[in-house]
Amino acid sequence: MSENNTKLKYLCDLEEKGRRQCMESEILVDKKKFFITFPYPYMNGKLHLGHLFSISKADIFSYYKEMQGFNVLFPFGFHCTGMPISASAKKLKMELANEGEIDISVVNILKSLGFKLYCSGKCTNVECICQFTDPFHWCRTFPKYCKASLVKYDANIDWRRSFITTDVNPYYDSFVKYQFTKLKNCNYISFGKRYSIFCPVDNQICLDHDRRKGEGVKPIPIVLAILGNNILVPVQEKDLNTIIDNNVEIVTQKEIQWIQFSINNDVYVAEEDIYNNIKYQVENVYKIKTVTLDGLYPYIIYVNSNIRKSKINNKNKILTENIYNKLIADRHEKMELIKYDKFIVCYVPEDTVISRSGGKCTVALMDQWFLDYSNPEWKEKTKICLNKLTASKDTKEKLELALNWINKWGFSRNFGLGTKFPYDNSVLIDSLSDSTIYMAFYTVKHLLFKDLEGKEPLFPIKYMGYAFWEYVFGNSNEINFIDPNDLNAKKIVEDARSQFNYFYPIDLRVSGKDLINNHLIFFLMNHVAIFKENNWPKRIYTNGHLLLNGLKMSKSEGNFLSVDTALERFGTSATRMCLAICGDTNEDANFVESMANSFVLKLYTLSQNIFLISSNNQSVNVADYTLIDYYLISSIKINEEKTFTSYENIVYRDVIKYGFYNNLDTIETYEMFGGSNSNLKHWAYYNMMKQLYPVIPSLARYFLNEVLTDISIEFKNIINQQYISGIEYIKELIHKINKFTKHDAKKVNLTLIKHYPPWKELCMKKIDELKLIHKNNNDLKKIVLKECSQFIGENNRKKGILFCMDYLLYKEKYIINFDEELYTNTFKSIIEQETKKKIIILIKDDSTKGEPLCPEINSC
C-alpha cells in the first residue's frame, strides 16, 4: 500500500469512528427551526460529483445551522416522474430482443454503473440488467444506491422523510392531485393547442429535461415558397424583398430525401425534414412516395457543402416583407395550413433536438393542458415574493428575467411515469410541474408511511384527498373527512398540521443555476398560488456547473467521477473540503483531483498534530499569558467570526480560508514565535475543529468527542486585533530583512521611526478634516489634492499624490494599533533566529528613508 493510501485509510478509519457517533435526533419544537431543501435527483442512475457539488452547498449549511442550535430539517427525496426512465426501460427491452436500431446502448450504460447481464430474458436476480425493462425497477433500485452514497458522504439528511414520486406512491399521488385541483380552482389551468417540440418515438412533447441534445431549442416559423409542381422550399430572411419568379434556383444536396405528400386534395413536394414537421401541424396529410427533384423541377443546383435545409438561390426576388409578416403573424390553434398566395408557413425546431429515447424531434401542434404562468395577477403576486426573497444579485436578476419571460406551460404528457391529471385521466402531469411544492410533503411524510413508496402505511390512504391537504396547510379547519371514531388517524392529521406549521416556510432552497428558468420560477409561482404569504420561500441559493480538472465532465471522454469513486479515492473529509473551495457563485466551479489529494495529506498531518498536543496537556494562569499567547487567542477567535460569517453568506471558499488555512498558519506562527502553552494549543485545535465541523463533520465529531476537550478561557480584554497586527508586522519584518540585506551580513541595524515625515502628517491631518466637511461630496478627491498641494513639494509631487489618495481610500493601513518598539524588542530573538543575523535596534523621531511600521534596514 502506498504512503498516500496508508494516510487515506488512517483518515477513513477516524471518519468511521466519528460517523458512528451520529444518531438521528428528535425534533424539539421549543427550538427554532431551519428548513433546507435541494431538488431531488432523477433516479435513472447513480449520483455523480456534479450532484454532490450542489448537495454540498445545502449540506454544509445544514450542519452550520445545527451548530447554531436550530432544529434543522434537511430531507431528501427521489424523483421518478417523466419519460427518461420509461424511455430507457423501453429501449432496453428492444435492445435485449434485438428489435430496431439502438443509438445508445442501455445495456452498456447499466454495465458502467456496475450491473451485469446474466440473461437476455426475465430472471429472478434483482441485480441483472434484464430487470430494468420494468420502469419501476429503476425507481426501486437507484434510491438505495443514492442513499448509500450520501450516508458515506456524511450528508446531514433526515432519511425518515424520503419518498419516491409517481402514482406508484399513493400518498404523493394524492398530494400532486391536490395541487392541480387547487390550481384549477384558481383558474391557473387552461386547455388549448400549441406548437411544441415533439418526439415521434415517444409520441409526446419533448421538454428540455427529456432531451439528449438540443436543450433550450424552441419552435420557430419558417416560410416556404410554393414553386413549380408545388415544390416547397424555405425562404431565407435575407430574401424578403419582392416578387416570385418562375426561374428560381433550388440549392440542395443529393443526399437530401424529398417526399411527395397530399394535404386534402393538393399534392406537394418537400424535403423529408419539412414533411415530418408539416404532418404534425396540419390535418389530412398523407405521404405518397419518396421522389427526386430531377424531372420535377428544371433549376436545381447540387452542392457538396453541409447545408441544414435546401434553399432558394438569392439571385431572384422572392417575398415582400409585408407578406412575410402576415404569414408569421397568422399563427392559430387549428390544424389547418397557413397559406397566402404562393407561400405557406410551418414550424420547425430552431436546431437539432434528440430525445432521450433517441428520436429526432419535430414541431407538432398539440392539444395541451397549460399552467397559465402568463397570468398577470399571478406574476404580480410572485413579484411580491421575489422582492422579499434573499438571493445573490445575479440569481435574483435571472429570476426576475425568468418571471418576465415565462408564458403558458404545457404540462400534459402521454408517455412516462407520473400522476394523472385529475380533470383528464388520459394524460400525465410532467416532471417539472409535479415538483414545485413537494417540499411541503417532506414536513408530513414520516407521519403517513414508513417506506419510500407508501407500501407501509402509518395513516389510512382512504383519508388522503383534497380535504386532508387543505386542513394540513391551514386553508380549512374542517376535519370531518376523518371517521370520528378513528382517534389515531385524527391525531396524525393534527400532528401533520403542526409539523407543517412548524417547519414552513422553506428557509433555504439550493439549486444549480440551470434550474432558474424553469424549476425555480415554477417553485416560486406555485408557492404563491397554493400557500399563504407567511409560507412563501425565504431564500434561494444557486451555483454553477462543476468542471473536473478544468474540463466539462464527460463519461465518453473519461473525465468523470461518480460520488462513490470520489469518496473511495479521497475519503469523505478531503472530498468535502475540495467541494467547499470549488466555487460559490453562478460561474462554473472546478474540482481538481490534485487538490483533493493535497487535502488528504493536510488532514492527515493535522490529525497527527492533534494527537501529539492532546497527550501533553497542561494548565496555565491567565496572568502568565504572553504577547504570543494573546496573538493565538485573538487570531483563532477572529478567524472563527470570519468563518461563521462566510458560512452565513454561503461563501465556503472563505470558510476554508479562515477556518482551515488561517487557523493552521496561526498555530504554526505561535510555535515559530516560541509559543509553548500546550493548553492553549489544545484549545486552538478544539476551536478549529468546531469551525470546520460543517465541512468535515465525522472527522471533527471524532476529535471533538474523543480526543479534544473544551477548555474554558476568560476572553475579556484578550481578543484584540492589535495582537495579530503586531505579530504580522514582525513576520513581514523578517521577510524584508531576508530579502533586502546581504546574505553574508552578520549584523543588521534596525532603525524604528516614531513619526511620519512632516509633510505626510500635515496631509493626513488635512485629509481627516476634509472627510468630515465633504463626506458626501463626489469631488472629494479633487478637493484633497488641491488642499494638500501646499504640503507637497514640487520634487515630491507624484509620490505625494499617490500617498494622499492611498490615505484617503485606505486610512486603516496607517493606523498603528500596537507598540512597534515593544514588539520588536520582545521578538528580537525570533527575528535573529529566522534571519540568522544579529539585530541592533535603534530609534529615530523621523527619517527620509523610513516611517512608522517601515523601519530603516541596514546590514553591516
From Swiss-Prot:
GO CC annotations on file: cytoplasm
Gene Ontology terms, MF aspect: ATP binding; leucine-tRNA ligase activity
Residue ranges that the Swiss-Prot or TrEMBL entry lists as coiled coil: none
Motif ('HIGH' region): 41-51
Gene3D superfamilies for this protein: HUPs (3.40.50.620)
Pfam families: tRNA-synt_1, tRNA-synt_1g
UniProt key word Protein biosynthesis: yes
EC number(s) stated in the UniProt entry for this protein: 6.1.1.4
GO biological process, alphabetically ordered: leucyl-tRNA aminoacylation
Binding site for ATP: K555
Protein's UniProt name: Probable leucine--tRNA ligase, cytoplasmic
